[in-house]
């Protein structure tokens, strides 16, 4: 079933659990407040990202972890995910098109020699999006494509002279 788990330790928990040095870039998330959207800081101490080909394996491992941490940790949030059609998000667009793959993906997320005590580790930020699906579904496909900056069916990115400067693609290109 391809069972895998990634464990993460939050900034405050790190200091309580470990006496030695901390990863150089480990810090609490700073809340972001924009004109229309906010990203609040909701720190946690432990994160377990569990994945498998079937949900029962995820459930079993999650239950075992929670059981082992009983009395020491309390579950404050739990999210189940699933593969949606051909790698699309719930808005109907292909997700992760620009994400690196293969060794480039590993290089993009792995701590290297710059913080040698933690080389091979990584950092994680979790974002939870709440979409107004009724409003989204009320938009025409053309309007949705302008919001995202890609063609919905073909996943082709709009040309720069057509793509709105405030589209998802324009604002989230690193």
Name these PLM-found stretches:
Residues 1-174:
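Long, histidine/aromatic-enriched segments associated with O2/redox biology
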């Amino acid at each position: 079933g391809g069972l895998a788990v990634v464990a993460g330790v939050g900034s405050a928990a790190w200091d309580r659990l470990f006496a030695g040095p901390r990863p150089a870039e480990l810090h609490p998330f700073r809340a972001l407040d924009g004109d229309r959207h906010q990203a609040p800081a909701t720190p946690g101490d432990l994160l377990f990202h569990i994945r498998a080909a079937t949900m029962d394996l995820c459930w079993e491992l999650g239950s075992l972890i929670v059981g082992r941490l009983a009395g020491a940790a309390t579950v404050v949030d739990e999210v189940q995910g699933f593969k949606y059609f051909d790698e699309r998000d719930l808005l109907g667009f292909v997700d992760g098109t620009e994400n690196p793959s293969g060794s480039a993906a590993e290089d993009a997320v792995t701590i290297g020699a710059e913080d040698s005590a933690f080389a091979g580790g990584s950092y994680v930020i979790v974002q939870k999006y709440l979409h107004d699906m009724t409003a989204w579904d009320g938009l025409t496909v053309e309007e949705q494509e302008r919001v995202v900056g890609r063609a919905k069916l073909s996943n082709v990115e709009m040309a720069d002279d057509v793509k709105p400067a405030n589209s998802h693609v324009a604002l989230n290109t690193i």
